[in-house]
Amino acid sequence: MTLDIVNWKAIIEALLYAAGDEGLTKKQLMSVLEVEEVALLDMMSAVKEEYQKQERGIELIEYADSYMLLTKKEYSIYLKKLVETPSKGLSQAALEVLAIVSYKQPITRSEVEEIRGVKSERVLHSLVAKALLCEVGRADGPGRAILYGTTPTFLEQFGLKALDELPPLPENVEADGVQEEADLFFENFNQTFEEIK
Protein backbone atom coordinates (compact mmCIF):
# COMPACT_ATOMS: atom_id res chain seq x y z
CA MET A 1 0.00 0.00 0.00
CA THR A 2 2.84 2.44 0.82
CA LEU A 3 4.42 1.74 -2.57
CA ASP A 4 1.12 2.61 -4.26
CA ILE A 5 0.97 5.94 -2.42
CA VAL A 6 4.56 6.75 -3.42
CA ASN A 7 3.71 5.90 -7.02
CA TRP A 8 0.59 8.11 -7.00
CA LYS A 9 2.62 10.99 -5.58
CA ALA A 10 5.28 10.57 -8.25
CA ILE A 11 2.67 10.36 -11.01
CA ILE A 12 0.91 13.52 -9.77
CA GLU A 13 4.23 15.34 -9.55
CA ALA A 14 5.15 14.28 -13.10
CA LEU A 15 1.76 15.34 -14.47
CA LEU A 16 1.87 18.76 -12.82
CA TYR A 17 5.47 19.31 -13.91
CA ALA A 18 4.55 18.46 -17.51
CA ALA A 19 1.50 20.78 -17.37
CA GLY A 20 3.74 23.72 -16.45
CA ASP A 21 2.26 27.17 -15.85
CA GLU A 22 -1.26 26.14 -16.81
CA GLY A 23 -1.56 23.43 -14.17
CA LEU A 24 -4.29 20.79 -14.30
CA THR A 25 -7.93 20.94 -13.26
CA LYS A 26 -9.40 18.47 -10.80
CA LYS A 27 -11.42 17.04 -13.68
CA GLN A 28 -8.27 16.44 -15.77
CA LEU A 29 -6.45 14.79 -12.87
CA MET A 30 -9.44 12.58 -12.03
CA SER A 31 -9.66 11.49 -15.66
CA VAL A 32 -5.95 10.69 -16.09
CA LEU A 33 -5.58 9.01 -12.69
CA GLU A 34 -8.97 7.27 -12.96
CA VAL A 35 -9.99 8.20 -9.42
CA GLU A 36 -13.03 9.81 -7.80
CA GLU A 37 -12.88 13.37 -6.45
CA VAL A 38 -12.65 12.28 -2.79
CA ALA A 39 -9.61 10.10 -3.52
CA LEU A 40 -8.00 12.87 -5.58
CA LEU A 41 -8.48 15.44 -2.81
CA ASP A 42 -6.89 13.06 -0.28
CA MET A 43 -3.92 12.49 -2.59
CA MET A 44 -3.44 16.19 -3.36
CA SER A 45 -3.58 16.96 0.35
CA ALA A 46 -0.87 14.35 1.02
CA VAL A 47 1.33 15.70 -1.79
CA LYS A 48 0.88 19.28 -0.57
CA GLU A 49 1.74 18.28 2.99
CA GLU A 50 4.87 16.47 1.83
CA TYR A 51 6.11 19.54 -0.05
CA GLN A 52 5.51 21.71 3.02
CA LYS A 53 7.38 19.39 5.38
CA GLN A 54 10.46 18.95 3.22
CA GLU A 55 12.98 21.62 2.35
CA ARG A 56 11.93 21.81 -1.27
CA GLY A 57 12.03 24.74 -3.66
CA ILE A 58 8.52 24.10 -4.96
CA GLU A 59 5.05 23.76 -3.50
CA LEU A 60 1.66 22.53 -4.64
CA ILE A 61 -0.82 25.37 -5.14
CA GLU A 62 -4.58 25.16 -5.69
CA TYR A 63 -6.24 27.99 -7.61
CA ALA A 64 -9.54 28.31 -9.47
CA ASP A 65 -10.30 24.57 -9.15
CA SER A 66 -6.86 23.66 -10.58
CA TYR A 67 -3.51 22.54 -9.21
CA MET A 68 0.00 23.56 -10.21
CA LEU A 69 3.57 23.43 -8.96
CA LEU A 70 5.13 26.80 -8.11
CA THR A 71 8.38 27.90 -6.58
CA LYS A 72 8.12 28.81 -2.91
CA LYS A 73 7.87 32.52 -2.13
CA GLU A 74 11.01 32.49 -0.02
CA TYR A 75 13.05 31.68 -3.12
CA SER A 76 11.42 34.26 -5.37
CA ILE A 77 14.32 36.69 -4.98
CA TYR A 78 16.61 34.27 -6.81
CA LEU A 79 14.11 33.65 -9.58
CA LYS A 80 13.58 37.38 -9.95
CA LYS A 81 17.30 37.82 -10.60
CA LEU A 82 17.18 35.06 -13.19
CA VAL A 83 14.20 36.26 -15.19
CA GLU A 84 14.19 39.99 -14.49
CA THR A 85 13.85 42.03 -17.65
CA PRO A 86 13.06 45.71 -18.11
CA SER A 87 9.46 46.67 -18.89
CA LYS A 88 8.12 43.26 -17.84
CA GLY A 89 5.55 44.77 -15.48
CA LEU A 90 2.15 46.20 -16.31
CA SER A 91 1.62 49.88 -17.00
CA GLN A 92 -0.39 52.06 -14.64
CA ALA A 93 -3.21 52.14 -17.19
CA ALA A 94 -3.24 48.33 -17.37
CA LEU A 95 -3.31 48.04 -13.57
CA GLU A 96 -6.18 50.53 -13.39
CA VAL A 97 -8.22 48.59 -15.94
CA LEU A 98 -7.46 45.27 -14.20
CA ALA A 99 -8.55 46.75 -10.88
CA ILE A 100 -11.81 48.06 -12.30
CA VAL A 101 -12.64 44.82 -14.10
CA SER A 102 -11.70 42.61 -11.14
CA TYR A 103 -13.99 44.48 -8.74
CA LYS A 104 -16.84 45.31 -11.15
CA GLN A 105 -16.99 42.31 -13.50
CA PRO A 106 -18.76 41.59 -15.71
CA ILE A 107 -18.22 45.06 -17.17
CA THR A 108 -18.28 46.68 -20.61
CA ARG A 109 -15.56 48.81 -22.20
CA SER A 110 -17.73 51.93 -21.97
CA GLU A 111 -18.28 51.35 -18.24
CA VAL A 112 -14.51 50.99 -17.72
CA GLU A 113 -13.96 54.21 -19.68
CA GLU A 114 -16.61 56.02 -17.64
CA ILE A 115 -14.80 55.12 -14.42
CA ARG A 116 -11.33 55.94 -15.76
CA GLY A 117 -12.35 59.01 -17.71
CA VAL A 118 -10.21 58.01 -20.71
CA LYS A 119 -10.44 55.60 -23.65
CA SER A 120 -9.42 52.09 -22.65
CA GLU A 121 -9.92 49.97 -25.76
CA ARG A 122 -6.21 49.38 -26.45
CA VAL A 123 -5.49 48.55 -22.81
CA LEU A 124 -8.37 46.05 -22.73
CA HIS A 125 -7.14 44.39 -25.94
CA SER A 126 -3.62 44.18 -24.47
CA LEU A 127 -4.90 42.55 -21.27
CA VAL A 128 -6.98 40.07 -23.29
CA ALA A 129 -3.86 39.24 -25.35
CA LYS A 130 -1.96 38.60 -22.09
CA ALA A 131 -4.80 36.28 -20.98
CA LEU A 132 -5.49 38.38 -17.87
CA LEU A 133 -8.96 39.35 -19.11
CA CYS A 134 -11.45 37.62 -21.39
CA GLU A 135 -14.92 38.02 -22.87
CA VAL A 136 -17.44 36.58 -20.42
CA GLY A 137 -20.63 37.46 -22.28
CA ARG A 138 -22.60 40.21 -23.96
CA ALA A 139 -24.56 43.04 -22.36
CA ASP A 140 -28.30 43.36 -22.94
CA GLY A 141 -29.40 46.33 -24.99
CA PRO A 142 -28.35 48.02 -28.22
CA GLY A 143 -25.05 46.85 -29.69
CA ARG A 144 -24.74 43.90 -27.26
CA ALA A 145 -21.41 45.22 -25.91
CA ILE A 146 -18.74 42.73 -24.83
CA LEU A 147 -18.63 42.02 -21.10
CA TYR A 148 -15.12 41.57 -19.69
CA GLY A 149 -14.00 39.50 -16.73
CA THR A 150 -10.78 38.15 -15.23
CA THR A 151 -9.24 34.77 -16.10
CA PRO A 152 -7.59 31.91 -14.17
CA THR A 153 -4.27 33.37 -15.40
CA PHE A 154 -5.16 36.64 -13.62
CA LEU A 155 -5.76 34.73 -10.37
CA GLU A 156 -2.49 32.85 -10.80
CA GLN A 157 -0.42 35.95 -11.59
CA PHE A 158 -1.77 37.82 -8.59
CA GLY A 159 -1.47 34.87 -6.19
CA LEU A 160 -5.21 34.45 -5.66
CA LYS A 161 -7.33 31.30 -5.45
CA ALA A 162 -10.56 33.20 -6.04
CA LEU A 163 -11.80 36.76 -6.52
CA ASP A 164 -13.10 36.92 -2.95
CA GLU A 165 -9.45 37.08 -1.85
CA LEU A 166 -9.12 40.57 -3.36
CA PRO A 167 -8.73 43.22 -0.65
CA PRO A 168 -12.14 44.66 0.24
CA LEU A 169 -12.98 48.19 -0.81
CA PRO A 170 -13.76 50.57 2.07
CA GLU A 171 -17.53 50.85 2.55
CA ASN A 172 -17.55 54.36 3.99
CA VAL A 173 -16.25 56.13 0.88
CA GLU A 174 -18.59 58.78 -0.54
CA ALA A 175 -18.93 58.71 -4.31
CA ASP A 176 -17.95 62.26 -5.24
CA GLY A 177 -17.22 61.31 -8.82
CA VAL A 178 -15.86 58.65 -11.08
CA GLN A 179 -12.26 59.88 -10.73
CA GLU A 180 -12.33 59.22 -6.99
CA GLU A 181 -13.72 55.74 -7.67
CA ALA A 182 -10.95 55.04 -10.18
CA ASP A 183 -8.30 56.26 -7.74
CA LEU A 184 -9.71 53.98 -5.04
CA PHE A 185 -9.71 50.98 -7.37
CA PHE A 186 -6.15 51.62 -8.44
CA GLU A 187 -4.85 52.22 -4.92
CA ASN A 188 -6.29 48.94 -3.59
CA PHE A 189 -5.25 46.93 -6.61
CA ASN A 190 -1.76 48.41 -6.82
CA GLN A 191 -1.23 47.59 -3.14
CA THR A 192 -2.08 43.94 -3.83
CA PHE A 193 0.17 43.94 -6.90
CA GLU A 194 3.11 45.34 -4.90
CA GLU A 195 2.65 42.74 -2.14
CA ILE A 196 3.00 39.82 -4.55
CA LYS A 197 5.80 41.20 -6.73
Curated annotation (Swiss-Prot):
Where in the cell does this protein reside? Answer: Cytoplasm
Signal as UniProt keyword: no
Give me the disulphide-bonded residues: none
Q: Which UniProt keywords apply?
A: Cell cycle, Cell division, Chromosome partition, Cytoplasm
Protein's UniProt keywords contain Cell division? yes
Per the UniProt entry, what are the Gene Ontology biological process annotations, in alphabetical order? Answer: cell division; chromosome separation; DNA replication
Give GO cellular component annotations, separated by semicolons: cytoplasm
Q: Name the domain of life.
A: Bacteria
Matching entries from NCBIfam families are given as:
SMC-Scp complex subunit ScpB
Task: Cite the record's note on assembly.
Answer: Homodimer. Homodimerization may be required to stabilize the binding of ScpA to the Smc head domains. Component of a cohesin-like complex composed of ScpA, ScpB and the Smc homodimer, in which ScpA and ScpB bind to the head domain of Smc. The presence of the three proteins is required for the association of the complex with DNA.
Matching entries from PANTHER family are given as: SEGREGATION AND CONDENSATION PROTEIN B (PTHR34298:SF2)
User: Which HAMAP family would you find in this protein's record?
Assistant: ScpB
Q: What does this protein do?
A: Participates in chromosomal partition during cell division. May act via the formation of a condensin-like complex containing Smc and ScpA that pull DNA away from mid-cell into both cell halves.
Q: Which family does it belong to?
A: Belongs to the ScpB family.
The protein's name in its UniProt record: Segregation and condensation protein B
Species name for this entry? Bacillus pumilus (strain SAFR-032)
Q: Which gene encodes it?
A: scpB
